Curated annotation (Swiss-Prot):
This is Large ribosomal subunit protein bL35. The gene is rpmI. Keywords: Ribonucleoprotein, Ribosomal protein. InterPro entries: Ribosomal_bL35 (IPR001706), Ribosomal_bL35-like (IPR021137), Ribosomal_bL35_CS (IPR018265), Ribosomal_bL35_sf (IPR037229). GO terms for cellular component: cytosolic large ribosomal subunit. NCBIfam families: rpmI_bact (TIGR00001). Pfam families: Ribosomal_L35p (PF01632). Belongs to the bacterial ribosomal protein bL35 family. GO terms for biological process: translation.
Length: 67
C-alpha cells in the first residue's frame, strides 16, 4: 500500500508544535480591512492554537505529523 500523502493546503496553513498542539494564522485579515476597526485588526494579529474539535480533521490531513 502506498504512503499517505499530506494535503498541500494543510501543510501551508498549519505547523505542529513540539508539544503536539497545532498553530494556525487568524482568518479575516486579507482584504476588506477598511470596515474593520483598529482594535478588531489588532486582535486578529498573531498565531493561535487549533481547537480540540478540529484536531481530528487536521490529523487526517497531516498523516506524517504524528498527531
Amino acid at each position: 500500500m502506498p504512503k499517505m500523502k499530506t494535503k498541500s493546503s494543510a501543510k501551508k496553513r498549519f505547523r505542529v508544535r513540539p508539544g503536539g498542539t497545532v498553530k494556525r494564522g487568524q482568518a479575516f485579515k486579507r482584504h476588506i480591512l477598511t470596515k474593520k476597526t483598529t482594535k478588531n485588526k489588532r486582535h486578529l494579529r498573531g498565531i493561535v492554537n487549533v481547537h480540540e474539535g478540529d484536531m481530528g480533521s487536521i490529523a487526517k490531513m497531516l498523516p506524517s505529523a504524528g498527531l
